[in-house]
Structures are given as structure tokens and as C-alpha cells.
């Protein structure tokens, strides 16, 4: 499914797919630093979210980054992501003060969903510096 997200997301940086198993292994071994939540309907996997908590001085508490959120195309518009955010608000194991996420400019459906849930745009831009290998 990680392949699906990164193949659809035109705004995403190129991703080395060999990182996918490393991310899964790290999240399983270090749940306080990353969690993967799977979205299931019956016995079918319909999507996933990758969550990364960290302390934010600006927010005065734990901020949870929804680093990746993907619902399979055939399962979209069925309330899966909305249900996930409701679940997250009720069952996140750490005391969090806010959620943050990125959305691709062309993903208007996801943006509408996030705004309907109360997410707002920040004035700051996200910049990234990648360390040389």
C-alpha cells in the first residue's frame, strides 16, 4: 500500500522503496516514535496511516504527524478516513494536543475531508533539507 500512496502523490519526493520495510520494522520496535494503523473492512485491507508523535514547543505538548494516510481507490468515499480520525481522537495512547498532516495540492477530496474535520492551513511553509549520503 505504501507503493500505492507514493505512486499517486505527485507532490511527494521520490521514495526509495527499500525504506518501506525499514519503516515498518522501526514502527513495530519503537511504538512511541511511530505507529502504523491498518484500515480493515472484514478481512480486506483498505488502507493505512503512519503516525509520528513528537513534543512540540510551539503547541506545548505532543503533536502527532499523520505522515502517511492512504485509502485504496475502491474504498474511498466510504468514511474510512473519517472513522480513522474519530478513532484516533478516542484511542491515541499518548496525550496529544494536535494533529498535523500534509496534503498534495491536487488532492481536493482529501483536503475537503481534512477541512471538514477542523484541520486548517498554517501560514508557514514546510521546508526540507536532506543530508548528503
Enumerate the predicted regions with their spans:
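Alpha-helical elements of Rossmann-like donor-binding domains used by nucleotide-donor carbohydrate transfer enzymes
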Residues: 1, 22-23, 44, 83, ...
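Conserved GNAT-fold acetyl-CoA-binding loop/helix
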Residues: 2-25
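A short helix-loop-beta-strand connector motif used in the catalytic cores of GNAT acetyltransferases and
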Residues: 25-38, 65
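Conserved beta-strand in the GNAT
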Residues: 36-38, 44-53
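Conserved acetyl-CoA binding element of GNAT-fold acetyltransferases
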Residues: 61-73
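Conserved acetyl-CoA-binding loop-helix of GNAT-fold acetyltransferases
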Residues: 71, 77-90, 112-116
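Conserved active-site alpha-helix within GNAT-family acetyltransferase domains
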Residues: 82-83, 105-123, 131
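Conserved GNAT acetyl-CoA-binding A-motif
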Residues: 85, 92-103
Amino acid at each position: 500500500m505504501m507503493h500505492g500512496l507514493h505512486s499517486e502523490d505527485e507532490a511527494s519526493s521520490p521514495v526509495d522503496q527499500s525504506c518501506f520495510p525499514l519503516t515498518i520494522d522501526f514502527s513495530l520496535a519503537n511504538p512511541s516514535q511511530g505507529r502504523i494503523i491498518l484500515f480493515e473492512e472484514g478481512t480486506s485491507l483498505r488502507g493505512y496511516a503512519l503516525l509520528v508523535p513528537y513534543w512540540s514547543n510551539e503547541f506545548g505538548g505532543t503533536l502527532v504527524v499523520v505522515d502517511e494516510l492512504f485509502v485504496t481507490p475502491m474504498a474511498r468515499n466510504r468514511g474510512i478516513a473519517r472513522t480513522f480520525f474519530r478513532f484516533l481522537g478516542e484511542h491515541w495512547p499518548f496525550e496529544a494536543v494536535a494533529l498535523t498532516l500534509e496534503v498534495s495540492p491536487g488532492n481536493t477530496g482529501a483536503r475537503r475531508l481534512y477541512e471538514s474535520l477542523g484541520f486548517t492551513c498554517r501560514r508557514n511553509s514546510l521546508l526540507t533539507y536532506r543530508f548528503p549520503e
